[in-house]
A protein has these predicted regions:
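Amphipathic alpha-helical interaction surfaces in cytosolic regulatory modules
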Residues: 132-135, 225, 232, 257
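Conserved short strand/loop->alpha-helix "switch" segment adjacent to the catalytic nucleotide/phosphoryl-transfer site
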Residues: 200-233, 270
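Positively charged, polar, low-complexity stretches
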Residues: 1-185
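Conserved beta-strand-loop-beta-strand hairpin that lines the nucleotide-binding pocket
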Residues: 230-304
């Protein structure tokens, strides 16, 4: 039994706010923050938003801003969608109340990286969908703020499908499956095939250096490939090629991955020497694409 003094975890409360003016932003943000300030067993709310919206809140709240955290969204969302998952998990572990209790108002950078290309946008929609599963055990209350003037109608419509408080919400696994149904471009004919049953980190590092990666980046890329290969098991083959300034490795394991959360769940504490697998690859690569096939899978890592 959970007592009032000892709140239990869950469920994750994942909401969406769409606004098209400063007034509409404040009309949804201020009640949410008041709710968070009044919630028992919680630290003060945190707002991750565009600098202009943070200024609106400062002006509206005045001295009432108090201990509310105000974070420019370009500082929070400084990397990939997978990085944002790690950022959120780390913040909750360090700062949330019992069971993950905290109110977070979160505005992704749709005018920047998140909205810069259809591929990037797809990864952020995946992030929004999988958040419903990844954070399900926690009692966190998240309000995802969408400025329709910046995000645009297509992104807002896609995001509505990922938030349980909308009438068009869909199963996160269905959305992930839709995104993974988009075929990847075929590897180029001159892709380099790596010898052996598993790619050697040294060979990947040397190849990446020849392609122009700095030694430190080549080391990170080689480690990501090795970690992913170790997690995926026996490989049919591994290919390397350059895509503009980026280095790409495609791993072809002989078995399917069959896990839409692969690489998105932070690994548990492990003994020294044990790897972090696809989690590490997703954290350091620009993209990690997984496509299951009848006789195995294609797992493509793009660095840079």
């Amino acid at each position: 039994m959970t007592s009032q003094a000892d709140p239990g975890p869950g469920p994750f409360d994942h909401r969406m706010a769409v606004f098209g003016s400063d007034e509409e932003f404040l009309a949804q943000a201020l009640p949410f923050l008041a709710e968070g300030l009044a919630a028992p067993h919680e630290p003060p709310p945190v707002v991750i938003a565009a600098p202009g919206n943070l200024d609106l809140l400062r002006d509206a709240l005045g001295p009432g801003t108090g201990d509310i955290g105000l974070v420019p969204h370009t500082e929070w969302y400084s990397g990939s969608a997978a990085n944002a998952i790690a950022q959120g998990a780390g913040h909750l572990a360090a700062h949330a109340g019992p069971g993950g209790r905290i109110h977070l108002l979160m505005e992704p950078v749709w005018g920047g990286r998140a909205g810069r290309s259809p591929r990037e946008t797809a990864e952020w929609i995946r992030y929004e969908a999988l958040a419903n599963l990844l954070f399900a055990p926690l009692a966190t209350t998240a309000l995802c703020a969408y400025d329709a003037r910046v995000a645009g109608a297509a992104i807002v419509a896609a995001a509505r499908r990922t938030h349980p408080d909308t009438p068009v919400y869909e199963d996160p696994l269905r959305i992930a499956a839709e995104l993974d149904a988009v075929p990847l471009p075929a590897p180029p004919a001159d892709a380099e095939r790596l010898p052996g049953p598993a790619p050697a980190a040294g060979a990947v590092r040397t190849w990446a250096t020849v392609q122009g990666l700095a030694p430190a980046d080549a080391e990170v890329f080689a480690t990501a490939v090795a970690e992913a290969a170790a997690a995926l098991g026996p490989l049919d083959r591994a290919l390397l090629w350059a895509d503009g300034p980026a280095c790409v490795c495609e791993l072809r394991p002989v078995r399917r991955v069959d896990d839409p959360l692969a690489g998105f769940v932070p690994p548990p504490d492990t003994a020294p020497g044990q790897g972090k697998g696809l989690w590490f690859a997703r954290q350091v690569c620009a993209y990690v694409d997984v496509r299951d096939e009848p006789d195995g899978a294609s797992v493509r890592l793009q660095y840079g």
